[in-house]
């Protein structure tokens, strides 16, 4: 079977999307119930956040069994129903591959703690506190990446939380297990993997073989994927400099795609300053071996908005605009808010952000709920603030659950982002809603392959205007996106008759386009 092209990915937290059995948790069958909605929206792939058995302390990333599904979500039969139903609608299922660490409750680690020498080799230990310069991912929650384990009588390394010990991928049996986990899920029909914490995986592989700085591990993973389905997407989480993207991709011999943290940072700097030139600057900083269609773009994800790739003054500019209160910030580097509250609930501004994102020539990710402007809950700890249930309608439980009294995390009813105001059902029936604008953009992008190509950045008459040209004459298209609050106007540099693909807050008169603040337009030369 040919690999399905990545056109648009929809990220789902299975615990928070749709409860099909009234127990208060999302389920895999609940996701299956909503596949028609995703097909209507224009989605080609679903990215499932972790659904494995886990210790319940880190959103499913603290895995206790890589082969079993959390029984609260369903079982293998439910997973197969989801895969088959999605495939029937032309949608592929991408799953998380979390093999840089496990939960401390994982049987492998428990055996290691108890002194089994074979399992001890699977993790990283030290008799003393190492002075290795490694910094924890979650300061000040974690003061160090090494924690004393009294039962094991040694320090244990964890790049993430203390209860998520690092696997030692320098140890051959661990690498063999990684490939076995991949094969297990490939044989059950998954359409790709999102690989968690890639730089830390290759860092340990380098200790077994320094060749290519440990990146050979990704080639072994590519070979395993290709043995089941050649060209299968391997999407890497690697928050590295853009100039290093090509090393992780290696023209498809390693990962197929990378999550583009670099441009995501520049994108939010542009939103904060109302200056589209920050996007253009970010687009110009890639190496020659990371074309746009190998990069994954998003607005917000399951975690904090991590701004580490910006300079300190740039980071502070984004913080001041979108996280002015201390409780909105986290880890000294990020923002724990969803997009809609960051942009003040402004539908035009949110839609403009989507128009810009979908103009980058990258593979876009829609996080569940972002298409309707789902809110956050700053009362929840850490990154949980952005992990709220989906709103399907304005009735009790918001359609997330039919038993709201049993809801694990209750959706808010009132306020600007409550389900009585923000929900799918209402927006599907409301002309010019955020949902219908996002759908229009996705559908037009799917219908016009020229918009999926890597664009050429043009010099605009105003720094607020992002001006991107796609394709070659006579089959060309143009994206015009106004990041600023004030109107701008521009001559359209396309030849031949013009056709409007998408237009909001924009007016075309002859060959001149007038854009209001946060207005946008996609134009095409006839035939594009």
Feature names for model-found ranges:
Residues 1-496, 502-528:
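Active-site and adjacent substrate-binding regions of carbohydrate-active enzymes
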